[in-house]
Amino acid sequence: MTKNIHDVAYELQKAIAENEDFKTLKESYAAVQADAASKNLFDEFRTMQLSLQQKMMQGQEITEEDNQQAQEVVARIQQDAKITKLMETEQRLNVVIGDVNKIIMKPLEELYSAQQQA
């Protein structure tokens, strides 16, 4: 009997929510949100990050001033232990999600690589 792919996706969603790295990420995010200075700095970082991504997607040039502002914010973030822990945990979870994505995409990869070899 074939499994419904959406049911499997919901199982995966639940597994991610129960993952220790995700639980730690939630705790780290709550700690950042509870500290006014950390929250403001994190919000500033996210705003800057989204602005730079938007510029790149629109084909606009990232200026030297943009780079300098980004470097200044990153330098301040590296001094904030709460944000640093949040970002490290997010990176670990991103690795897990990337691994899962590779597994999910394997049938397509095999299909297309078999087509190229034929």
Swiss-Prot record:
InterPro entries: Com_YlbF, YheA/YmcA-like_dom_sf
UniProt record similarity statement: Belongs to the UPF0342 family.
HAMAP family, A to Z: UPF0342
Protein name from the UniProt record: UPF0342 protein BCG9842_B4422
Source lineage: Bacteria, Bacillati, Bacillota, Bacilli, Bacillales
